[in-house]
Design a protein with these regions (language model features):
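Short, charged helix-capping/linker segments at alpha-helix termini
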Residues: 3-6, 22-30, 41-60, 191, ...
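Internal acidic/polar
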Residues: 10-14, 101-127
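Short, Lys/Arg-enriched C-terminal cap helix and immediately downstream tail that follows
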Residues: 44, 96-99, 141-146, 175-197
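Structural recognition of an alpha-helix C-terminal capping motif at a helix-to-coil junction
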Residues: 56-63, 77-89
Length: 197
């Protein structure tokens, strides 16, 4: 059985479990948790970088699945993508709450947020190359620019929220993001035009 076929069967099983969960089947939710929680937990842990918080948020995700399984729409994406979207949203909410509570932001390694969800070994290799290239591009940024961009694009904070978290004027945050994005565009241009393989 090919990896692609195996993944398709897996997604079909998860979709069936979500449907049964929507009908109130607790055993289906338990099975869904057993099958998918390692991926969900892994994504949340990458965002929060705190095992205990990631465990709590993972449980929150499956509580949300129990309550909202009927909202899953197969036409809008795979069951795995839906679960990861819920996980990412919950993790970002927790990150924002923690950053607001502590009034600061922990060190950020934006490149670590490029989780691999490749279907084939070729896609995995391509993803690794892309992550390496993005890491190199991020290295051209100042620490301040990298931090502001990570908060905006990976953690979903608004520019006002970033200014508040970093205790900086809004204009400074906007400048850091704008200049950082210009540098990133220049650094990523060879990759986008296919000059880098």
């Amino acid at each position: 059985m090919s990896l692609e076929t195996s993944r398709l069967i897996q997604e079909q099983e998860w979709g069936h479990l979500i449907t049964r969960t929507a009908q109130g089947d607790q055993a289906a939710l338990a099975t869904l948790y057993d099958r998918t929680s390692p991926q969900v937990f892994g994504l949340i842990l990458k965002i929060l970088n705190n095992r205990e918080a990631a465990e709590e948020v993972t449980l929150d995700v499956y509580t949300q699945v129990w309550r909202q399984a009927n909202t899953y729409d197969r036409t809008r994406g795979t069951p795995g993508a839906w679960l990861m979207m819920l996980a990412r949203a919950r993790a970002i909410d927790r990150f924002r709450a923690g950053a607001a509570e502590h009034g600061r932001v922990e060190s950020l390694d934006a490149a670590q947020l490029f989780a691999s969800d490749a279907d084939t070994p070729e896609q995995e290799v391509e993803g690794q190359e892309r992550r390496k290239f993005v890491q190199q591009a991020l290295a051209v940024l100042t620490v301040e620019q990298r931090q502001a961009i990570a908060l905006a694009y990976f953690y979903g904070l608004s520019q006002s929220e970033i200014a508040e978290q970093l205790q900086l004027p809004l204009g400074t945050v906007k400048t850091r993001i704008r200049l950082g994005m210009i540098k990133l565009r220049e650094a990523l241009a060879p990759y986008e035009t296919g000059l880098v393989s």
